[in-house]
Amino acid sequence: MDHPSREKDERQRTTKPMAQRSAHCSRPSGSSSSSGVLMVGPNFRVGKKIGCGNFGELRLGKNLYTNEYVAIKLEPIKSRAPQLHLEYRFYKQLGSAGEGLPQVYYFGPCGKYNAMVLELLGPSLEDLFDLCDRTFTLKTVLMIAIQLLSRMEYVHSKNLIYRDVKPENFLIGRQGNKKEHVIHIIDFGLAKEYIDPETKKHIPYREHKSLTGTARYMSINTHLGKEQSRRDDLEALGHMFMYFLRGSLPWQGLKADTLKERYQKIGDTKRNTPIEALCENFPEEMATYLRYVRRLDFFEKPDYEYLRTLFTDLFEKKGYTFDYAYDWVGRPIPTPVGSVHVDSGASAITRESHTHRDRPSQQQPLRNQVVSSTNGELNVDDPTGAHSNAPITAHAEVEVVEEAKCCCFFKRKRKKTAQRHK
């Protein structure tokens, strides 16, 4: 399973590795066995594999000092397209002030691997979407949208564009944690600096770029080979919001002889689907959002507050209460592959940055602890599962992350659903 490679110019711009704390690895193989305990750094014990991908492996880990579970990403040092250090660099660039970002506890070598230790989060929006019979109510979508606009604004404020919007990359917090209602953004493996760190200027507009992102949600301009900027992240979010409301998008399930032709068909269908048709039977604000983001100039800074207000005003007009009572609250979450049950006291650290997020949550805790990856490029470990989340990776010139991937490793079957309207 190939993970999309970064463009050559981005690799050249990547600075040499930062000085890290010295890492300790008890055995260089990077795998566990009964003969010894594999450690990453001074205090992170490596447990069982809970996911894998071209980057390497995702392991369950434990902080022996705090007794808390963590996620550990292991990437071979000799990887053909190393990205873990770049992702770590972006996490450090984002800092710890933003709400809804996973804590990064450690990065360093571990034998033949580079290892990154991250906060363990809950299930992804895609998993929760399945749990809710593949449709969300308007209230749930608006609570998600208001939060994710703030997440993306924060990412952009740190001179980064995300370029990988998909439900698998947005996770709620862990069960029993006071921030389990917070939507987190994860996996910055495809992120890019849109402000050149040397010139401090916006990157230039370019065409004939290879596709980077997830075909189902990416912007129309990305399909056309145009360099991505802030506008493209917001358009991809809009497509994802409509996916949640409708249950599916008009460009899903298209067939073609080759992957390149398939992605071309997806892009053509997006362009030929009027916004009014895409948003039919839903509030006009959804169409207004998409019209606004699609009209943005490549260099233009989006008016995030205008877009948030668009949704908050609709939220209030509908008489909703921002109580975090999402559609999945109260539903039993199936035990995922690689799940562990932990103390309710094992808490994650998140940051509050917007006043509406300070309101107390009235939701009930989810019943089962979920071990989630912090990378959307993972397969279900169970090879017998009927639903495969493996990405279909195109040829080198088409850097596309396929439509459906799983963060929480549920054993499940994908249900065929018609469009549903709430």
Swiss-Prot record:
Q: Which residues form the Protein kinase domain?
A: 44-315
Where is there biased composition of kind Polar residues? 361-377
Q: How would you describe the post-translational modification of this protein?
A: Autophosphorylated.
Instruction: Cite the entry's keywords alphabetically.
Output: ATP-binding, Cytoplasm, Kinase, Nucleotide-binding, Phosphoprotein, Serine/threonine-protein kinase, Transferase, Wnt signaling pathway
Gene Ontology terms, MF aspect? ATP binding; protein serine kinase activity; protein serine/threonine kinase activity
Return the annotated region ranges for Disordered: 1-36, 351-389
Presence of keyword Cytoplasm? yes
Q: How is its activity regulated?
A: Repressed by 2-(2-hydroxyethylamino)-6-(3-chloroanilino)-9-isopropylpurine (DB08325).
* GO-annotated cellular components: cytoplasm; cytosol; nucleus; plasma membrane
Q: Which family does it belong to?
A: Belongs to the protein kinase superfamily. CK1 Ser/Thr protein kinase family. Casein kinase I subfamily.
> Per its record, how is this protein called by name?
Casein kinase I isoform gamma-1
Q: Which organism is it from?
A: Homo sapiens
User: Which gene name does the record give?
Assistant: CSNK1G1
